Structure formats: C-alpha cells, structure tokens
Amino acid sequence: PRELADRVGVVGQDPLAGFVTDTVEEELAYGMEQLGLPGDVMRKRVEETLDLLGVADLRHRALRDLSGGQQQRVAIGAVMATHPRVLVLDEPTSALDPTAAEEVLAAITRLVHDLGVTVLIAEHRLERVVQYADRALYLHGDGTVASGRPAEILATSSVAPPVVELGRLAGWDPLPMSVRDARRAAAPLRERLAGRT
C-alpha cells in the first residue's frame, strides 16, 4: 500500500535485479522522483546518502560495473534516500565476500546510529549479523516464533553460529555473539592453560 511506501523500505538479496536506472546517482534519485519530491530536496538527499554510505566516489559509475558490496550499499542508499522509518533487508550479505559483507553491515550500523532507522534483516548466515542485532526472531518449524535478545534466542535454538556453539560447549554465560566476545570469555582458560606449561 502507498502509505507503507513512505515508511518501509525493502532491499532484496540481488540488488542488480532491483535497479531501474543505469548510474549510482540516478538510482539514488529514482525513488524520490516517484514520490514527487522537489529537485532541491532530491539533490540534498542524494549528497547525504552518497556521504553516509561511503559511495560518493561512485556517483557517476554504471551500476553493473560495481562490486557486489558496492551494489548492495547503493541499493540500500536508494531506499534510504526516501527516508523510511523501517528498512527491511533480505539476505544483505548472501552474495558477498567477508570484507564486502563487513562494509555493508558497517553502513547499516551507521544508518541505525545516525538516522535512528529500524532495520529488520532476514539472514541465514547468522554469524555475520548476530553481533549487530538488538533483538532476534526464531521461526520454528511448527510456525511458532521465539523473540528476544540474540543470546536468549540462540541459547536454546537448534540453529546457531559456530561461535555460539563453542560458547554452549564451554558453558560460557553470557554466550558469545562474536569472535571478540569468545576471546574475552576464553581469556581465563588461556591463562590457566599457559600456567600449566
């Protein structure tokens, strides 16, 4: 519905399939043109979006010539230029290498912190995104849904990133959500093991 278009932005997992223009700048402006925003507002928002997502140097580049991570950031930027309150991302890191995935997740984090946008991510690679999440939803096979802090949900779910599985096996509380968390939790164990040699 039209009223949701102003509030919710959606980015699919294949950004190139969703692009409707040829260049970065045109793509960032397209959604605003469809909403009938004045030219001066569009120009200002395009500049802000280019800066916020770190793609200003790509302004005149053809979308098809961008890397996967750059395409994903432009797709997110094109949606964000319309100023939605909620951003829905379908597997935003699925086709990206680890470095590009980190760049996209850093851009998403900036959106949350700088603009106060609510971001909903559907992702199979939990290890990439769980450390960024404030809340998690786990959809059980029987149709029920568990909701809570990521550590609460992952403590009992049948699906968890390897670092969480390690935390379960080691009996760590709280469970680590990132490798950094696991290193902190393992520090006392490393010290004990170092004392034995």
Question: What do the predicted segments below correspond to?
Answer:
Residues 83:
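Conserved catalytic motifs of ABC-family nucleotide-binding domains
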Residues 79-80:
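ABC ATPase C-loop
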Residues 40-58:
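Conserved ABC ATPase "signature" region
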Residues 139-176:
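Conserved beta-strand-loop-alpha-helix hinge in the C-terminal portion
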Residues 123-124:
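H-loop/switch region of ABC-family ATPase nucleotide-binding domains
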Residues 98-100:
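Helix N-cap at the start of a conserved alpha-helix in ABC-type nucleotide-binding domains
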Residues 87-90:
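Catalytic Walker B motif of ABC-type/P-loop ATPase nucleotide-binding domains
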Residues 62-66, 70:
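Conserved ABC ATPase signature
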